[in-house]
Amino acid sequence: MSEIRVSCASSGVSVSAARDQFSSLPHLKAWIELEFSVSVSEQLLLTVAAEQVKMAHLGTQNELFVFDRSVVGGTVSNEHKYSAPKLKTLTPGTDPSQWALTVLTHCSRLVEETKRVTAEIATIKRATNVAITQMKQHSQNLDKNLLNVKEYSKELNQGITPLLSVDLAQLRDNTRAVKLVAPAVFGKKQFLNDWLDLQQLQSIVVEFKADFPSCMDKLQTLEQDLAQLSKDTQTLVNSTDVWIGGTNSDVLCNEAVGILRKLSELTSGDHVTNEAVKSVQNCQSQILDLHKALSKAKFQTVQHSQKVLQSISQLQSRSTKLKPKLTHIGSELTKYEEKRVQAMKQVDVEFVYGCVLVEMLRRTVWSQSGGENGSVKSEIGTRVAWKKQFQDTFPFVDILNEQEDLTIDTISTSSPSIVHNLVIARPVVTDYISQVSSKEVRNNLESLLGGVTGSAAATSSFPRSLFRNGSISGSLMAERAPISSATNADDKIRGYEARIRKLEDLLYKQRMSQDTSRWSVSPGTPSAGFAVVSPGQLSSEARGSSLSPEPTETREQVKAREKAEEEARKAEEERLARDKAAAEALQSKVDQLSQSLLHTENEKNDLMANLASMESDFSRERRCLVQEISELKLRVEELEEQVETAAETSIERHQRADQETEELEQRLKAMTLAQNTVDDENSRLKITLQDMSQRLYTGYKRNCVLLESLGLQAQKEYDADGSEVVSFDIHRVKGLRKKHRGKKGEKTEKDSESDSTDDFSALYWATKTTPDSFESSYRTFLARIFLDYDLYVEKVAKRFEDLEHLARKLQKEARNYRTMTQQLDDETRSKIALNRFKVGDLVLFLPTRDPSRQPQPWAAFNVGAPHFFLKQKPGRELKDRDWLVGRITGMEERVVNGGIGDREENPFDLGQGLRWWWLEAEEE
């Protein structure tokens, strides 16, 4: 069973699979999704020939390439930094020989990895080359379509140019003077001008002058865009060819294989010397360096390949946008061509009408000649070609096509060329040609008329295309394509008809000879022994007898003679009547035979047609049978070969079965030993599983604690048996953070709290389950520790965003409050305080009314009359001032303890126990 290799273009990994493994393309794509982790919707499958994979390719192709659309399209970022693989260097131990063997095993594994990496690099380059090939094919197809549209537009422009120079007034005058030969036949129109729609023709010409240049400008702009696209494509191809052809990775891989071979020779001996140890270390370091170099080369190859594929995707995206524009321009040109053809039909109406007259004349001449000088089938072919040539020009052309039954019987027994009893004479056609104003059209019509001779042989031919040269008249005189009417089947039929005609002539002559022999003697004819005497003979005889010397007749003799003459006359009349009746009977018989002959002729034609059909069916059936016999013979030979092969295979299978029996016995022993090993491994795995379960459960609980510390809580719903998580959500719980910190918080009616209880029974699921319930217990454990990490990350991130938003909001409010405080402070500092003085207030000081004291005391102006006095400073002169505004720099509170006159304790003679303040101020 042959296999097909499927390679991933982004990683270079290749996997082989059986060809008959896949029943459909969806099946193949589902398998690729499992193998390469590329979703079905993002897969692009290409063959080595850069064709999209179809079901038929699975049986013919040896390798398929898988492209990831998300990587090719650039939706997945490929900006990754290279991280070198961490490789362990083995140091020498106490046993150099054992260490050398370990190094050899380790290096062998590294060399195998280098081979695999080299193969993956080659696969990536092949896949990139396939993508480049597909891009070039796409670009070439687009250039080819553009070339076709350009050629089509060039021909259309050449066809439109003469149309724009047509003089419509001259055309109207020329056609107005032409009177139709039979108005009743030509739709009851009197003149050729009645078939024209000059208003429509004028609108088409105006549209060509106004809109067609803009269409050509669009085509020119599109041509420039496609030229730039082709240039960019070629630039990408040239830059990629050198990279694809590089062989640096192969050189590194071959070098690693050579070093491994040298290392194997060093470790082949029983004892490893100190010099060999150094050589082994050197080989080990070289292989490690080569492995790192190849790993870096693969990383660079993947990065470069992704950039190339993304460039290809961008170029194809540009071409995809340009292709509809090219298609739209092509459709516009097609519409212009249809309008051009419609206009040229009216411009060439003189030539079309002349062709109709010439064809009428040719058919009239052919019908009048009886078709003796030409083949009927050739005439049919000529008429069919003429109909195909002119059927889409003007409705009056249909007068030569309607009621035409182009078959052998109708065209040979009637005159189908003279439709509606319309017979055209050569002078009518000649007169019309002389009225045509265009010399080119006149010459073409004269050339066609010259082909209509007196015999009117049906040998005319017509051009393949009507308007290829710009007009009907110019097209008709272009390259001619002869109509072939002679085939082998027709020759055989004509030979059979000639033989049948000869046999019918012989049969007809034989019947006529028999009828003549029967009709030569009528029943009333006298016998040969009696003479039939006419009246003229009797008179001559009488005259002769009167001159003779015979004696005179008696009366009795005269009566007898007259009686005999009367009887002879009556007998002659009866004979003439009988001959006339016989002639009428003969004529009716001839008419009957003519009708019978015509009926026989029709039957003969039917029989000949049936004979030809049966002969064709028999020939076809015979060919099918011969082919079937040949296929059956080949099938028999194949079956005989298969039987021989099956016999040989059966013998080989018996021998192989005996060998397999022995191998199975040995494998059974090995499996018993392996079973014991597996049991030991299972015991070890159970311990590992228990440790891993504990770690997973611990991680799950820590994640839950983290959520609770943020005020979030995970909520899950299980199915009936608790093995599947039906729904999972993370929502915020008010007060949960306070509870987590051990603080108490107030609760509203809508507040809710969640008490999470630890279910440690799920932690020991591996030790409490049986092999039958292992799967269900495992699924239950997974359900218990399930966390939707996408939702987890989303909720935590959103929570942090909310906290950051709240912090920014509070910071903004704090800045606002700080600004307001500063503003209030500034405002306060600029106002004079009246009470509740404090350091920094602006105070108005006034002199007291006790001028006897020296120096005169000053008091602070305030509300409520508390005692605030200004403390004098040395050098300050206030005696000549009426007021002082100063800012308090210091305050000293005092209580009166001394009596009046005590300058230290009561300098202002205040009452005992009264509280007063010394104020130190700086003048503002």
Swiss-Prot record:
It is a peripheral membrane protein. Residues 514-525, 538-551 have a biased composition (Polar residues). Residues 552-582 have a biased composition (Basic and acidic residues). Residues 552-682 form a coiled coil. The keyword Hydrolase does not apply. Residues 514-533, 538-583 are annotated as: Disordered. GO terms for molecular function: molecular adaptor activity; protein kinase binding. It holds the Pfam family ATG17_like. GO terms for biological process: autophagosome assembly; autophagy of mitochondrion; pexophagy; piecemeal microautophagy of the nucleus; protein transport; reticulophagy; ribophagy. It comes from the Eukaryota. It is found in: Preautophagosomal structure membrane; Vacuole membrane. Keywords: Autophagy, Coiled coil, Membrane, Protein transport, Transport, Vacuole. InterPro entries: ATG11 (IPR040040), Atg11_C (IPR019460), ATG17-like_dom (IPR045326). GO terms for cellular component: Atg1/ULK1 kinase complex; phagophore assembly site membrane; vacuolar membrane. Involved in cytoplasm to vacuole transport (Cvt), pexophagy, mitophagy and nucleophagy. Recruits mitochondria for their selective degradation via autophagy (mitophagy) during starvation. Works as scaffold proteins that recruit ATG proteins to the pre-autophagosome (PAS), the site of vesicle/autophagosome formation. Required for the Cvt vesicles completion. Belongs to the ATG11 family. Homodimer. This is Autophagy-related protein 11. It comes from Yarrowia lipolytica (strain CLIB 122 / E 150) (Yeast). The lineage of its organism: Eukaryota, Fungi, Dikarya, Ascomycota, Saccharomycotina.
